[in-house]
From Swiss-Prot:
Subcellular localization: Secreted, Extracellular space, Extracellular matrix
Induction remark: Down-regulated by the CEBPB-NFE2L1 heterodimer during odontoblast differentiation.
This protein's UniProt keywords: Biomineralization, Calcium, Extracellular matrix, Glycoprotein, Phosphoprotein, Secreted, Sialic acid, Signal
Tree of life domain: Eukaryota
Lineage, broadest ranks: Eukaryota, Metazoa, Chordata, Craniata, Vertebrata
Region (Disordered): 54-113, 146-687
Protein's recorded name: Dentin sialophosphoprotein
Record keyword Signal present: yes
Residues recorded with modification Phosphoserine: 226, 253, 278, 292, 298, 315, 337, 345, 366
């Protein structure tokens, strides 16, 4: 027995001992091989990028310091070149730097390359480059503040004109590297990249926004650092595309981008610029929240027909939002103006993207006070253009349908892209269901289209937005909306389609408009109250979120009816920021709201959205009463201005109530119920 036991033990010991040496070396070999493979592949690839990036970034971090010094001292081209060196953070410092310094066209191309390489390098060496780039960005942000405090406003405009695109792309890559961590950093430069990542409008948006303003890239640069500095973006966009001074930029782009850029430029202007900064900067921050969200749909919108047109605008803008928000805002803050500097401050202050959304909306709203209505029109579709711009941010998220919506208002590609999008999508954006709301909005818009005769006035989403706009606008001051929006927004013809009816009815008979346009629409709303009122409550969901946003945005709309409308869009875009954007929009833009209650159509629009949904619902029931009060407010643009202020505040309250579901009594509650129903329907539609 002992012998057997000993033999057994020996056998067991040998059996146990033999595999161990075999398995251990095999595992070691496997581990070593596998370790070697990742280290070779990952560091090999990343190491190159990281080498370039880290070298460029380490160089650029000092260069960022030098940037600050040189930018502060030199103000202009050294910023560009240091910006190029910052782009060198992207990894292609020398080619990028000379080319960017050499030409904007090259800087656009280079920007693409820099985006490509820099973005890859950034992703590859993103951590190091992000850390270093963040250092550089800190230096840049500080330098941007210095620059913005320094002659940044003056010289950077020159730089903006001359080297803004390059400077922006440079800053974009630098900032990308800097803020590559958030992927919004990727969105910065990589909004083109990220757009490229999305792949819908990759080359188109990279190339087109770059071509458009070369501010896409610049905007891409902007996007991440500020995270949604639509002003900076628009500045970038307006600057490169406009290649003009702030004001020229304002008209320089000529596009919605130009308007946005112009508004951003106005933000550069430092007058509206700072105001646009405050609302614009805040809006930009809000816009940036939109940016991230939008960027997802930004690719879609980029994929959209207007993804090219509107996306060049929108994409540039949204790239500007996504892309252009941060970096160029950073160095546009350095380069462009204290406004964008303020935007950076606001962007830094509001990195959440809340204020940036407003800024984008604000800038987008510079596309038109349309935009300011947009938020409401987002609900109202009336400010489709400005909504378009803001909707762009929003539409970026939901751009495919936006593309559909874009088509009707193709003239205002951004706004058009955003109009329908802005309308349904703002609601959807507001409904942080963005896509869900949007799809539901499109569907409900389309559903409203059949349901509501007004919605058949124009295109599907546009008319839906329009009829909803008209409805809401008809009630909430289609006259004022139409007066503001109709006057401002020729391309609100869709909105005017319902809105002129509504506007005529509203201006002639606001109650009739509410009863007629809005009543029929509202009765369609009431009949299709779930569909239209789902739209309405989609709008009211938008009014719920969007009205909150719209409220903030309406407040924002009222604040910068154009800016705020885009802010409302950005508010809508910032669904997460939505409440915050309601706070920011409502607070910042509400102050502006009361200020720019002159955009009472916005206030009215928000009222019109909430109250006019209210009036629409109430309008069917109490069409002349609610609609009288609403339409009175709405029809009295001035009264609705005052009312817009109070009602904007009320609209804020009622939109907050709308968020609460209390709404403007009937329709807001209904809309809120419908809004939740429509939110459910949003989800359902999207589902």
């Amino acid at each position: 027995m002992k012998t057997k036991i000993i033999i057994y033990i020996c056998i067991w010991a040998t059996a146990w001992a033999i595999p161990v040496p075999q398995l251990v070396p095999l595992e070691r070999d496997i581990v070593e091989k596998s370790a070697d493979v990742p280290f070779l592949a990952h560091p090999g690839t990343a190491a190159q990028n990281e080498l370039h990036i880290n070298n460029a970034t380490n160089d650029d971090s000092p260069k960022g310091s030098e940037l600050g010094r040189q930018v502060h001292s030199n103000g202009g081209y050294e910023r560009d070149r240091n910006g190029s060196e910052s782009i060198a953070v992207g990894g292609k410092s020398s080619p990028t730097q000379p080319i960017l310094a050499n030409a904007q066209g090259n800087s656009a191309k280079e920007r693409e390359d820099v985006e490509t390489y820099g973005h890859d390098g950034i992703h590859a060496g993103g951590e190091n480059s992000t850390a270093n780039g963040i250092r550089g960005q800190v230096g840049i942000a500080e330098n941007a503040e210095e620059a913005k405090e320094s002659k940044v406003h003056g010289q950077p405009h020159q730089d903006t004109k001359t080297g803004l695109a390059s400077d922006t792309s440079q800053n974009g890559d630098a900032t990308l590297v800097q803020e590559n961590e958030p992927q919004v950093a990727g969105s910065k430069n990589s909004t083109n990249h990220e757009v490229g990542t999305h792949g819908s409008g990759v080359a188109a948006q990279e190339t087109t926004p770059q071509r458009e303003g070369e501010g896409s890239e610049n905007q891409g640069a902007e996007v991440t650092p500020s995270i949604g500095e639509g002003a900076g973006l628009d500045n970038t966009e307006g600057s490169p595309s406009g290649n003009g001074i702030e004001e020229d930029e304002d008209t320089g782009s000529g596009d919605g981008v130009g308007a946005d850029a112009g508004d951003g430029r106005e933000s550069h202007d430092g007058t509206e610029g700072h105001e646009g900064q405050s609302s614009g900067g805040n809006n930009d921050n809000r816009g940036q929240g939109s940016v991230s969200t939008e960027d997802d749909d930004s690719k879609e919108q980029e994929g959209s027909p207007n993804g090219r047109g509107g996306d060049n605008t929108s994409s540039s803008e949204e790239t500007g939002i996504e892309e252009g928000d941060g970096t160029q805002t950073t160095q546009d803050n350095q380069n462009l103006s204290p406004t964008e500097g303020g935007i950076i401050s606001q962007a830094e202050a509001c990195p959440s993207g809340q204020s940036q959304n407003q800024g984008l909306e604000t800038e987008g709203s510079s596309t038109g006070n349309k935009s300011s209505i947009t938020k409401e029109s987002g609900k109202l579709s009336g400010s489709k253009d400005s909504n378009g711009h803001h909707g762009m941010e929003l539409d970026k998220r939901n751009s495919p349908k936006q593309g559909e919506s874009d088509k009707p208002q193709g003239a205002a590609e951004k706004s058009d892209t955003h109009n329908n999008m802005g309308h349904s999508r703002i609601g959807s954006s507001s409904n942080s269901d963005g896509h869900d709301s949007y799809d539901f909005d499109d569907e409900s818009m389309q559903g409203d289209d059949p349901n509501s005769s007004d919605e058949s006035n124009g295109s599907d989403g546009s008319d839906d937005a329009n009829s909803e706009s008209a409805i809401e606008n008809g009630n909430h001051g289609d006259a004022s909306y139409t007066s503001d929006e109709s006057s401002d927004n020729g391309s609100d013809s869709d909105s005017h389609a319902g809105e002129d009816d509504s506007s005529d009815d509203t201006s002639d008979t606001d109650d009739s408009d509410s009863n007629g346009d809005d009543d029929s629409e509202s009765k369609d709303k009431d009949e299709s109250d779930n569909s239209n009122h789902d739209n309405d409550s989609d709008s009211e969901s938008k009014s719920d979120s969007s009205d909150s946003d719209s409220d903030s945005s309406d407040s924002s709309d009222s604040s910068d009816s154009s800016d705020s409308s885009e802010t409302s869009d950005s508010s809508d875009s910032s669904d997460t920021s939505d409440s915050s954007d309601s706070s920011d929009s409502s607070d910042s833009s509400n102050s502006s709201d009361t200020s720019d209650s002159s955009d009472s159509s916005d206030g009215d629009s928000s009222d019109g959205d909430s109250s006019d949904s209210d009036s629409s619902d109430s309008d069917s029931s109490n069409s002349s009463d609610s609609d009288s009060s609403d339409s009175s407010d709405s029809s009295s643009s001035d009264s609705s201005d005052s009312d817009s202020d109070s009602k904007d505040s009320t609209s804020d309250s009622s939109d907050d109530n709308s968020k609460s579901g209390n709404g403007n009594s009937d329709s807001d509650s209904d809309s809120d119920s419908d809004s939740e129903g429509s939110d459910s329907n949003h989800s359902t539609s999207d589902d």
